[in-house]
Design a protein with these regions (language model features):
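Short S/T/G/P-rich N-terminal loop/turn motif that feeds into the first structured element of a domain
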Residues: 1-55, 63-73, 94-102
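A common structural junction motif
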Residues: 27-30, 76-82, 88
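Short secondary-structure boundary/capping segments
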Residues: 50-51, 86-88
Length: 102
């Protein structure tokens, strides 16, 4: 299984509603995509205070690297990704992505 982890530093003027809309779109995409198992996204509520500016994150589990590739190339993912970048501090530099083979 591939665990796709995305952290974002949302701009201070980005509303929680806007972020929820982006996350809802990603969740709907995952629900309709073969090989994608689950979407979980939320603002950070960590008591450790080690976020280093990252305010929100989401995780998607995929059956395989091929399923992750299909997701990455999907037009809806690209559109939602562009919205996420537009609402991140310093654009793409405000987003961190890591994929784990678990």
């Amino acid at each position: 299984m591939i665990r796709h982890i995305v952290l974002t530093k949302c701009k201070p003027d980005t509303s929680q509603q806007r972020i929820e809309e982006i996350f809802a779109g990603l969740e709907q995409l995952v629900e309709n995509l073969d090989g994608a198992q689950a979407f979980t996204g939320a603002p950070s509520t960590s008591p450790e205070n080690l976020e280093r500016g990252y305010t929100h994150g989401f995780v998607i589990d995929f059956d395989s690297w091929a399923a992750l590739k299909t997701y990455a190339e999907h037009p809806e993912h690209k559109a939602l990704g562009a919205l996420l970048v537009a609402n991140a501090v310093n654009g793409i530099d405000g987003i961190l992505v890591i994929d784990l083979d678990v």
